[in-house]
Amino acid sequence: MQFEFQIEELEHKIEELKKFAEEKEVDLSDEIAKLKDQRDIALKVLYDDLTDYQRVMVSRHPERPYTLDYINYITTDFIELHGDRLFRDDPAIVGGLCKIDGKNFMIIGHQKGRTMQEKVFRNFGMANPEGYRKALRLYEMAERFKLPILTFIDTPGAYPGLEAEKHGQGEAIARNLMEMSGIKTPIVSIVIGEGGSGGALGLGVADKVFMLENSVYSVISPEGCAAILYKDPNRVEEAANNLKLSSQSLLKIGLIDGIIDEALGGAHRGPEDTAFNLKNVVLEAVNELEKLPVDELVEKRYEKFRQMGVFNR
């Protein structure tokens, strides 16, 4: 990322010193440690003051952990479940049964790809109606077996293709919103990267909604907003700022319940540390939600979303 050029220079110097020390068999550990300290200080200063559009760039970083990465980090005994039982399986959404610290969960999330082949297979994390219907099937299964649900949101948006529209994209998302509001089991949703519009909401009606520190959640991308609203693609930074899409902005206006700290320099630099923080937040939230009677749990979830956007003088 362009705004990290100073960090990249320091990391390049660190790698050069490591290589030189190995080749010449000399001890340069003190010099390397000093450079690492400089890098860490520079990272903290930079990431404490990112602009909204810089956070958008971090949320899209190609090395940022995806749903299956977090599943590998925080769960055991994961069994993936496939298909919507109506038409086909959509690999842009993955889900299944797992354990987190010995506790049974149903876990569901958007999945992007890393290689070009994987990106095409996963449709860049943009789900078709079949993906949302698969998710709904898993929600209902979790309710039937009294399993808490954990969802990961990471999509630029629902797939807008002609076939998706023919198969009822709008209906599939709308039905998920309706059904999730009444599912009789605890639901925790976490935005781990991009939270793009209705495509994100299809997995986002939950008792507790959290965002990773450098994730974003918005009705439209900054690029789309700049093109449609300002008729100027160069105004993406202004659009990002006006959309209030960062975790910090959304926490202030009450649209999310909390922010999960990422590793220094973003989740892509410390995926295991970020996953550890995420796991602790999930377990704490679920333990709290399970203390509520089911009817009260559902009523509070419904009221939580009904209150969003209400204007009080």
Curated annotation (Swiss-Prot):
GO biological process: fatty acid biosynthetic process; malonyl-CoA biosynthetic process
Pfam families according to UniProt: ACCA
Boundaries of every CoA carboxyltransferase C-terminal domain copy: 34-288
Keyword terms: ATP-binding, Cytoplasm, Fatty acid biosynthesis, Fatty acid metabolism, Lipid biosynthesis, Lipid metabolism, Nucleotide-binding, Transferase
EC number(s) given by UniProt: 2.1.3.15
PROSITE patterns reported for this sequence: COA_CT_CTER (PS50989)
Location, primary (coarse class): cytoplasm
NCBIfam families: accA (TIGR00513), AccA_sub (NF041504), PRK05724.1 (NF004344)
Family label: Belongs to the AccA family.
Name of the featured protein: Acetyl-coenzyme A carboxylase carboxyl transferase subunit alpha
Encoding gene per record: accA
